[in-house]
């Protein structure tokens, strides 16, 4: 009798151990079951790399704006700074799934951690996407209404717009705490998020109709019309050159492309990157919530592809701004100059005499 009870107890322990191991080794890309290290290595490397790039890139943008007061005179800088702060917090928040993949306990119930993390990331990405749309509207007004632009876009209105963006982003994902469904797949690193917190077709449609679709439409509409205006300006310039040929015009044509064409190329890159990173996520979000497709690998890849937009934002929107590039160059020169001054001071200070066999540069 005792032996039979002991056998049953061992079987139960072994089965529970197998379940725990499978739960512990479940990795989003399906490369779990590591026999040597109990870590989702590939997923951890991807998230850590993205976290480092997002934090480093957006910290650079924030630091340049802080040290270059000239940038504050441009209305676009309000949205770029807001986007940089939101994307920076996205990078910091990405440390949470990294710790989960490394199997560090958060000290909080997994369901609560999953819900809070998913909500925060969704809000931050919403702020970032709304800022992208506002930047496109700002550039559209600057080109289509240059005379009344200063009256339409004032610092006070910009601050109100940024506050409304944060409030709207916080409210639109709030129903996820009241059983409406999962707001995204950012928390699917957690086991509870992936298996117990399901998406809802109605809530997904609600988010897409009130956030993703309007932002994508605004970006596409404004940049398409800006691109169209740039082409029209280029055509008018070429017509004037044909009517009034001169040596200066010919030489300027040979030296490089017109500013309108360069600006159009910047807009093309911005729009292309935006849709390449966000469109796969939105499509999968709709298909999975409609129970048409369910693939953890696609969920992981599309989610972190969209999150990588937080790094691409600071690269494209900042480096495409000539004033920002100037501020970054001056900041780099200042830092290099200060380093050289420190080295010169150290060189001028008397140093103890070195022995003959010591190394000196």
From Swiss-Prot:
Organism superkingdom: Eukaryota
Positions annotated with a glycan in the UniProt record: 2, 13, 20
Keywords: Cell membrane, Disulfide bond, G-protein coupled receptor, Glycoprotein, Membrane, Receptor, Transducer, Transmembrane, Transmembrane helix
Disulfide-bond pairs as recorded: 114-193
Cytoplasmic side stretches: 66-87, 138-159, 225-265, 318-361
GO terms of biological process kind: cellular response to light stimulus; G protein-coupled receptor signaling pathway; locomotory behavior; phototransduction; response to xenobiotic stimulus
Pfam families: 7tm_1
TM segment ranges: 45-65, 88-108, 117-137, 160-180, 204-224, 266-286, 297-317
Protein's membrane topology: Multi-pass membrane protein
Molecular function via GO: G protein-coupled photoreceptor activity; G protein-coupled receptor activity
PROSITE patterns per record: G_PROTEIN_RECEP_F1_1, G_PROTEIN_RECEP_F1_2
Main location (coarse class): membrane
Extracellular side, ranges: 1-44, 109-116, 181-203, 287-296
Compartments, record wording: Cell membrane
GO annotation, cellular component aspect: plasma membrane
Tissue localization of expression: Expressed in brain, especially in striatum.
Listed InterPro entries: GPCR_opsins, GPCR_Rhodpsn, GPCR_Rhodpsn_7TM
Family, as annotated: Belongs to the G-protein coupled receptor 1 family.
Role: Gs-coupled receptor activated by antipsychotics reserpine leading to an increase in intracellular cAMP and its internalization. May play a role in locomotor activity through modulation of dopamine, NMDA and ADORA2A-induced locomotor activity. These behavioral changes are accompanied by modulation of the dopamine receptor signaling pathway in striatum. Modulates HTT level via cAMP-dependent but PKA independent mechanisms throught activation of RAB39B that translocates HTT to the endoplasmic reticulum, thus avoiding proteasome degradation.
Record protein name field: G-protein coupled receptor 52
Organism whose genome encodes this protein: Homo sapiens (Human)
Lineage: Eukaryota, Metazoa, Chordata, Craniata, Vertebrata
């Amino acid at each position: 009798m005792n032996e039979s009870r002991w056998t049953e107890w061992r079987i139960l322990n072994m089965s529970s151990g197998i379940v725990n191991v499978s739960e512990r080794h479940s990795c989003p890309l399906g490369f779990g079951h590591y026999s040597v290290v109990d870590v989702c290595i590939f997923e951890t490397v991807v998230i850590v790399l993205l976290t480092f790039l997002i934090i480093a890139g957006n910290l650079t943008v924030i630091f340049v704006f802080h040290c270059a007061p000239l940038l504050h005179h441009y209305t676009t800088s309000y949205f770029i700074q807001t986007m940089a702060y939101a994307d920076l917090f996205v990078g910091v928040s990405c440390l949470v799934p990294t710790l989960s993949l490394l199997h560090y306990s958060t000290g909080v119930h997994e369901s609560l951690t999953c819900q809070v993390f998913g909500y925060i990331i969704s809000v931050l990405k919403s702020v970032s996407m709304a800022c992208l749309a506002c930047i496109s509207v700002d550039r559209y007004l600057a080109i289509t209404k240059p005379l009344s632009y200063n009256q339409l876009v004032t610092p006070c209105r910009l601050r109100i717009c940024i506050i409304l963006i944060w409030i709207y982003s916080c409210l639109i994902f709030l129903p996820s705490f009241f059983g409406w469904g999962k707001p995204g797949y950012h928390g699917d690193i957690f086991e509870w998020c992936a298996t117990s917190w399901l998406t809802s077709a109605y809530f997904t449609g609600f988010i897409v109709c009130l956030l993703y679709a309007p932002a994508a439409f605004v970006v596409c509409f404004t940049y398409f019309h800006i691109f169209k205006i740039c082409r029209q300006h280029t055509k008018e310039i070429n017509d004037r050159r044909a009517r009034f040929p001169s040596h200066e015009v010919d030489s300027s044509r040979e030296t490089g492309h017109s500013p309108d064409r360069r600006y159009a190329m910047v807009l093309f890159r911005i729009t292309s990157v935006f849709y390449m990173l966000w469109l796969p996520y939105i499509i999968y979000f709709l298909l999975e919530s409609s129970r048409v497709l369910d693939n953890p690998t696609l969920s992981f890849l599309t989610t972190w592809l969209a999150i990588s937009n937080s790094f691409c934002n600071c690269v494209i929107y900042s480096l495409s701004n000539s004033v920002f590039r100037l501020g970054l160059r001056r900041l780099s020169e200042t830092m290099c100059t200060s380093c050289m001054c420190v080295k010169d001071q150290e060189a001028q200070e008397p140093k103890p005499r070195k022995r003959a066999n010591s190394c000196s540069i």
